[in-house]
Amino acid sequence: MLCVMAGKVLHSSLTTPFLGNITHHMASEDHGWNLILVNHENYIPADYEVQLTELSNGKKVDSRIYPELQEMFNAARAQGYGLFVREGYRTQEEQQQLMNEKIEAYENEGKSKSEAKKLAEQWVAIPGTSEHQLGIAVDINADTTKSSRDDVYNWLEENAHTYGFIKRYPSNKTDITGVINEPWHYRYVGKEAASAIYSQGICLEEYIETLE
């Protein structure tokens, strides 16, 4: 069961400490809030606002995706799958902390600072480019006392689009998304877009191109 507690968050100014030589610009909301494209080249606008709903485990999501998220979880649980939201909305500061910790971990393994940054960015989104900062992406894990990870991930991959969610980083689209396969990371795009992305076997970047 998810519970509601709303609050308004205004993002602070974004920094780009791990940008390197990547050309970037602020993400466009031209196609609507649900289709805003955030990746290594598209930063979250500094004035982006999100109204949050708190889940029963303390994680938060954009209030606009809450009904479909609850509906999807109800459907999965009705079929015997145990699952929960491991990660939801993150602040700029929380994303920066994750990056710092990953870099430090690689440095502790003997990697140089530049090597550690490069490796960390393969696993952790550069602050300002994480969909978790939008509040419309969730990391969903299996309750392994009830279901295996593979069973939950398979169910999500086959059914999430029905509720407006997509597997954001498929294994066969890494060259486009710039992110390795993440079977737990689901992003809300709305039912129409999710169905098109699923049926065509494309990723969000490719779908956005069809709208241009």
Regions found by a protein language model. Name each.
Residues 1-212:
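Extracytoplasmic cell-surface/polysaccharide-interacting catalytic and binding patches
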